[in-house]
């Protein structure tokens, strides 16, 4: 998923 590097996740 994107959450580890996308601050708006």
Swiss-Prot record:
It is found in: Secreted. The keyword Disulfide bond applies. Disulfide bonds join 3-9. InterPro entries: Contryphan_CS. Coiled coil: none annotated. GO terms for cellular component: extracellular region. The modification Cysteine amide is found at residue 9. The modification D-tryptophan is found at residue 5. Expressed by the venom duct. GO terms for molecular function: potassium channel regulator activity; toxin activity. It comes from the Eukaryota. Keywords: Amidation, Calcium-activated potassium channel impairing toxin, D-amino acid, Disulfide bond, Ion channel impairing toxin, Neurotoxin, Potassium channel impairing toxin, Secreted, Toxin, Voltage-gated potassium channel impairing toxin. The cysteine framework is C-C. Exists in two forms, due to cis-trans isomerization at 3-Cys-Pro-4. The cis isomer is the most abundant and is thus thought to be the functionally relevant conformer. Affects both voltage-gated (Kv) and calcium-dependent potassium channel activities (KCa), with composite and diversified effects in invertebrate and vertebrate systems. In vivo, intramuscular injection in freshwater fishes (Poecelia pinnata) causes secretion of mucous substances, a reaction already observed in fish with other contryphans. Belongs to the O2 superfamily. Contryphan family. This is Contryphan-Vn.
């Amino acid at each position: 998923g994107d959450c580890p590097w996308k601050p708006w996740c």
